[in-house]
Amino acid sequence: MLKLGIIGTNIITDQMLDAAKTTGKYELTAVYSRTEEHAEKFGKPYGATQFFDSLEDFFDEGDFDVVYVASPNSLHYEQVRLAIENDKFVIVEKPAFVNPNEFEGIESLLAAHPKARVVEAARHIHTGLFHAAEEQLKQMPVIQGANITVMKYSSRYDKVIAGDKPYPNIFTAEFAGGALMDLGVY
């Protein structure tokens, strides 16, 4: 059983924890959030026993092998960096990093910490549609170019347009949100 720590207490994390539970291979042990109370409120129903509002304490005192990072995009680099420095396995939501310099920094850090691993949680590579497209491409004799359009209407967009901003990190450049950064990977 792999011990799992999480950074980010949101609907994506709920979905990931539900999926992890179905494998029978993960046990949630530690939760980091901006407040310890929120970490406990989120993590207790999943069986977590350690709750943190300090990233340093989370990594120093948390009992986990794998950390799942589902925070605002702009925070991924620093959180993944700390995980690597603590020789953790990392599953980070997409986009893992917001620019090439961050990726290169993590790549260098991984070379110095061979026990650590980083995986981007890019679910599209596991969908039937992706595999169907992959098979179709294999059957084509020559590919000289492609134009593929993927559209997704955000369930949060109407609230933002109405002036209600319950998710400040979703559509702002400050948190590396918006259509290109958040959905552009698809």
Segments from the language model and where they lie:
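Rossmann-fold dehydrogenase core element
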Residues: 105-124, 142-146
